[in-house]
Swiss-Prot record:
Keyword DNA-binding: no
Source organism of the structure: Vibrio vulnificus (strain YJ016)
Function of the protein: Acts as a ribosome collision sensor. Detects stalled/collided disomes (pairs of ribosomes where the leading ribosome is stalled and a second ribosome has collided with it) and endonucleolytically cleaves mRNA at the 5' boundary of the stalled ribosome. Stalled/collided disomes form a new interface (primarily via the 30S subunits) that binds SmrB. Cleaved mRNA becomes available for tmRNA ligation, leading to ribosomal subunit dissociation and rescue of stalled ribosomes.
The EC number(s) this enzyme carries: 3.1.-.-
Entry protein name: Ribosome rescue factor SmrB
Pfam families documented for this protein: Smr
GO terms assigned for molecular function: RNA endonuclease activity; rRNA binding
Enzyme class: hydrolase
Family: Belongs to the SmrB family.
Membrane-spanning residues: none
Length: 176
């Protein structure tokens, strides 16, 4: 036998002698119960997301939007300077929503979910790409955005963010 094998045997025998007579502690046999609140939290989260995505955008309400020039809107309490900054691309969107190929109902649901996501994650600027196509979403999207209480302003996006087929949206983030 080599010297290494003798050292290993000595180590094992020393360990056995050191732990001889030790009993398992009673608390080691207690199984941790799973946190039951996770199911309740999951249910609340799902219902909250469903209500966020079901934010009602009326097709009958038509806000007063400028018909001249590019599509733009600003609430009364928002400076026109902010709209100019949107137009120039000073605000860089952190979130992009591509609505190409969506129905109006899908687009409403996704738009509501995107706005809820932006408010939750404190995203101030988002880009909504509605496309041009048959002009259905291009006409409806500004009307829906103008109805949402968290939308401060929007403007037709600069070319690098989609041009005629997209809107840059400025959102109000409530202070915590």
């Amino acid at each position: 036998m080599s010297n290494k094998d003798n050292d290993l045997d000595d180590d094992f025998s020393l360990f056995r002698e050191a732990v001889q007579g030790i009993k398992k502690l009673p608390q080691d046999t207690i199984v941790q119960q799973p946190n039951r609140n996770t199911k309740q939290k999951e249910i609340k989260r799902i219902s909250r997301e469903a209500s966020d995505s079901e934010f009602y955008f009326s097709d009958e309400f038509v806000p007063l939007l400028s018909e001249e020039g590019p599509t733009r809107y600003a609430r009364d309490d928002v400076s026109t300077y902010e709209v100019k900054r949107l137009r120039r691309g000073v605000y860089v969107p952190d979130v992009f929503l591509d609505m190409h190929g969506m129905t109006q109902q899908e687009a409403k649901r996704e738009l509501g979910a995107m706005i809820a996501y932006c408010v939750k994650n404190e995203v101030h600027c988002a880009c909504v790409q509605h496309g041009i196509g048959k002009h259905i979403l291009k006409q409806k999207t500004p009307l829906w955005l103008a109805q949402h209480p968290d939308v401060l302003a929007f403007h037709q996006a600069p070319l690098e963010f989609g041009g005629d087929g997209a809107l840059l949206v400025l959102l109000s983030i409530p202070e915590k």
